Structure formats: structure tokens, C-alpha cells
Amino acid sequence: MTDAAVSFAKDFLAGGVAAAISKTAVAPIERVKLLLQVQHASKQITADKQYKGIIDCVVRIPKEQGVLSFWRGNLANVIRYFPTQALNFAFKDKYKQIFLGGVDKRTQFWRYFAGNLASGGAAGATSLCFVYPLDFARTRLAADVGKAGAEREFKGLGDCLVKIYKSDGIKGLYQGFNVSVQGIIIYRAAYFGIYDTAKGMLPDPKNTHIFISWMIAQSVTAVAGLTSYPFDTVRRRMMMQSGRKGTDIMYTGTLDCWRKIARDEGGKAFFKGAWSNVLRGMGGAFVLVLYDEIKKYT
């Protein structure tokens, strides 16, 4: 194997392992966030049974669905997240070679910053093309509030993918893909671009104290998450459309979804679950730092 291939494989492994560990740890927060985002578009959650907020959600989930339901959709998320994050990190470095080749970060700051934004955004969009059906399934499984058996919309990951494919074809598994690409470019651009730029400005980036790295990563994930959150809400709502027919369809398309959420629920609705997203972002910050630490030993 060439040095480039070995480097690519190390990036893939380090990113994937770090992501799988952190995602499982924050899975309960992730599910709360998803339920708050999509409950208005769920056939299972009637208006009188909607969650009032994070605390209400955390209290009611174990009572109504059991404690283990906090991890509903987590298998799909781990399977999805391993290649997603691994591909993001691996492609990020490849795109950095394209966008940042020959750029001096000290004398060409804005070009360096723009190159980091471009490489982060392109990496996120590229990896999304490969794993979107898994992201779709994770969302639908997390949104499934049935207690067990017949009450559940889907029995598991495979059942979800098969049912939606039979009902809507491949299009159903990619529902909300366009707005996802828009959101992922914004999120990844900030996530990687600002993080790498900030680390690059440090006197000795390779030997930065882990606490400083974590603080930078924490700030980056919070800002990136809030900036792209409305796009995430719209894409999750669009995912809830798959498998529906006729009058059950709430939104005719992405623009209609944006318009109806703003008109019927107000601007705040785009940010439902955003606070839990910031908490979840601690896991994302941990991934960035853990990835750098793992790479030191590989």
C-alpha cells in the first residue's frame, strides 16, 4: 500500500471508531431532539399527546415506551455514523489538498479560511450521498413512539427500509435529500472549517492541550449546529412524509414545508429541540478531539 492509502485508511478507522463511541453515549439526547423536531408531522403523536419540551420528553419516554427506547434507532445511527464520519474525515483531508495546496495560512488567512470551509462542506455533501437511506431510517425509527409489537410502525432497521422502498421506491429513502445537502454543507463547513482554522492559528497545533482542543471543538459544534438547525428540522419533517398517501401528505415539497412551518407554528418551530442539540454537540466536540488523539497513535 502507498503512504497515501495508509493515511486514508488511518483517517477512516480513527474517525469511525471515535464517532461510534460518542454517538452511542449521546443517543438518548438525540432521540429527544428528533421527537421534538418531528412530532408535528407524526401520525402516531396526536396534538394532545405532543411533548411540551425536553424535560417532558425525558420523563414520558421511559414511562410510555420503556427505558431502552431511548436508544431506538441507535443501531441505524451507529451503522450510518461510522461510514459518515469516517468518510467526512477522510475526504476532508483529500479536499484540503485540493483547496489548500500551496496556501500559506499565515500570509493568506482568508484564502486559508475559505479553503477550509470548502473542504469541510464538500466532504459532508459527498459522504451524505452514500449513507442517506441509513440516516432516513434512523430518523423514522427514533420517531416511532409505539410501545411494542403492533403499536410500532417499524420492527427495526431492515423492516423500515423494506417498507418504505416497497411503498415509495428509492425516492422515498431519499426524501428531504436536497435540503439535507444544503444543511450539511453549512454545518460541515463551519464544523471543520472553523475548527481547523482555529487550530491552525495556534502556535503548536499538534501539541495543543486536550482541554483547549475540546473548548474550540465545543464552540464550533454549538455554532455550526444552531446555524444549520432550521435545515435539519425541514429535512426531518420531509423524511416523515415517506410512506404517506393522499390527504396524509402534509407538505408538497421542501419550500412548502418551510412556508407551512413558519406560517402555522412560527419561527421558533425551526429550532425545536435545539437546546438538546447543543448538549448532543458535546458528543460531536468529543469526536473531533478524540479523532486528533487517535491519529497521534496511528
Curated annotation (Swiss-Prot):
The modification N6-malonyllysine is found at K23, K92, K96, K147. ADP binds at R80, K92, R235. Keywords: Acetylation, Antiport, Chromosome partition, Membrane, Methylation, Mitochondrion, Mitochondrion inner membrane, Phosphoprotein, Repeat, Transmembrane, Transmembrane helix, Transport. Residues 1-7, 100-109, 200-210, 292-298 are mitochondrial intermembrane. Residues 235-240 are annotated as: Important for transport activity. Solcar repeats lie at residues 6-98, 111-201, 212-297. The modification N-acetylmethionine is found at M1. The modification N6-succinyllysine is found at K43, K105, K147, K155, K268. The modification N6-acetyllysine is found at K105, K147, K155, K163, K166, K268. The modification N6,N6-dimethyllysine is found at K52. The modification N6,N6,N6-trimethyllysine is found at K52. GO terms for biological process: adaptive thermogenesis; adenine nucleotide transport; B cell differentiation; cellular response to leukemia inhibitory factor; chromosome segregation; erythrocyte differentiation; mitochondrial ADP transmembrane transport; mitochondrial ATP transmembrane transport. It is a multi-pass membrane protein. The matrix-open state (m-state) is inhibited by the membrane-permeable bongkrekic acid (BKA). The cytoplasmic-open state (c-state) is inhibited by the membrane-impermeable toxic inhibitor carboxyatractyloside (CATR). Proton transporter activity is inhibited by ADP:ATP antiporter activity. The modification N-acetylthreonine is found at T2. The keyword RNA-binding does not apply. A motif (Nucleotide carrier signature motif) lies at residues 235-240. GO terms for molecular function: adenine nucleotide transmembrane transporter activity; ATP:ADP antiporter activity; oxidative phosphorylation uncoupler activity; proton transmembrane transporter activity; ubiquitin protein ligase binding. The modification Phosphoserine is found at S7. Residues 38-74, 131-178, 232-273 are mitochondrial matrix. It comes from the Eukaryota. The keyword Repeat applies. Monomer. Component of the MMXD complex, which includes CIAO1, ERCC2, CIAO2B, MMS19 and SLC25A5/ANT2. Interacts with AK4. Interacts with TIMM44; leading to inhibit the presequence translocase TIMM23, thereby promoting stabilization of PINK1. Belongs to the mitochondrial carrier (TC 2.A.29) family. This is ADP/ATP translocase 2. It comes from Rattus norvegicus (Rat).
